[in-house]
Amino acid sequence: VSDLPGFFRDRCDKLPAFVSAVNAELRAQAYRKQLRIGLTENRSVAWGQYMDMADVLSRVADELGSLNGSDPLAERRLIRYLRSMDIDADASVYRDGGGRLHVTIESGRLTPLLREENYLEKLSAVVGARLCRSAAAAGEECSKLVLLEAEPLAVSVGIAAMKKKGEKVSGDKGTYFKTDAGVLCVILADGTGCGDEAAQDSAQVVAILEKFLRSGVDPAVAMKILNSVLLLRSGDSWGYATVDLMCVDLFTGETCFYKYGAAPSYVKSGKSIRRIKCETLAAGISMGAGIAPDTVRMRLRPGSTAVIATDGVIVDAEDEWLKQLLNKGFDDMKALARATLKEAESRYGVNDDMTVVTVRVEERA
């Protein structure tokens, strides 16, 4: 009422009702403005998602068009070998768009083959390429055997974690897996805050990103779609999350680090140690449609070690202690992860959730 001119207050017979009506209209106008802004942002994010999905479909079409086709000679050798074991089977041998060999054997009598000692080595000799079981097909029915060309590189992974003091659960979540393309994917997410809500946010982030990556979506595109999903759902119960994604091609050693708001990562190759920083904000913070994550590419050679950690472990730019740990030349990645976590705890306490993931690349034995 005091904001109104005196002459108006003196002449208005229903001043309280007038003030209430004006305030209600101002609130409604503010809500409408907020809604318009939200709709505009959502349209922008949705448009970015459509562009990303178009990119996904385009890549799928390119992959289908670049299939190298079946290998009939290898198929005939494989069928002859199976018949020599009295196994009547359907077999297919082909190379995908990336040149990786795929072998599928279907039969109701695979048990004699699987009971053979070193059956993978024998099948590898038949088709002329070293084979391994498909992780995606593990646990399938015993009437179907899916094999893939084995990668020349192998990895060992170590994980150590500690929840914030006084909390029942950690808000950090992570996972690692190998795709059928022979790419190791390591995901680490840190939900904002601590406790159950942060744990739920980070778990959802990891689950969504894993589904995209296992489906063959390009990692950079998968990260952008994840960011869009969090932007669209930030008005519900979801918060924000920092995201680390490391992808290692186990055929070539080509490695990409993708980051949204994440703490620095470290890579030791030979005698050099590289610090990989992040400039972007956490996933789910509105910063424009289609904003890509920070991306760093490099090649990891056998003997290289990477350390990925949440911000409870790496505080500010104080990292000389971590570099000293890396220079000690740990061969056991679990021991390196535990040592890193222990040193961080002694320096900074447990004022935040703390998670360390260590990765070492080696030649396959």
Regions found by a protein language model. Give the residues of each.
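Short strand-connecting beta-turns/loops that link adjacent beta-strands
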Residues: 180-182, 250-252, 364
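N-terminal entry segment of metal-dependent catalytic domains or homologous docking segments
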Residues: 126, 139-192, 197, 203-207, ...
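Soluble C-terminal extramembrane regulatory/interaction domains of multi-pass membrane proteins
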Residues: 1-126, 130
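Short hydrophobic/glycine-rich mini-motifs in sensory/regulatory modules
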Residues: 24-28, 98-101, 152-155, 180-185, ...
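PP2C/PPM family metal-dependent serine/threonine protein phosphatase catalytic domain
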Residues: 149-173, 227-233, 263-297, 341-347
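Catalytic core of PPM/PP2C metal-dependent serine/threonine phosphatase domains
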Residues: 69-99, 118-141, 150, 199-270, ...
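Active-site-proximal, acidic helix/loop segment immediately C-terminal to a metal-coordinating Asp/Glu
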Residues: 193-215, 281, 287, 304-351, ...
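Conserved beta-strand-loop-short alpha-helix elements that form
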Residues: 182-194, 257-261, 296-319
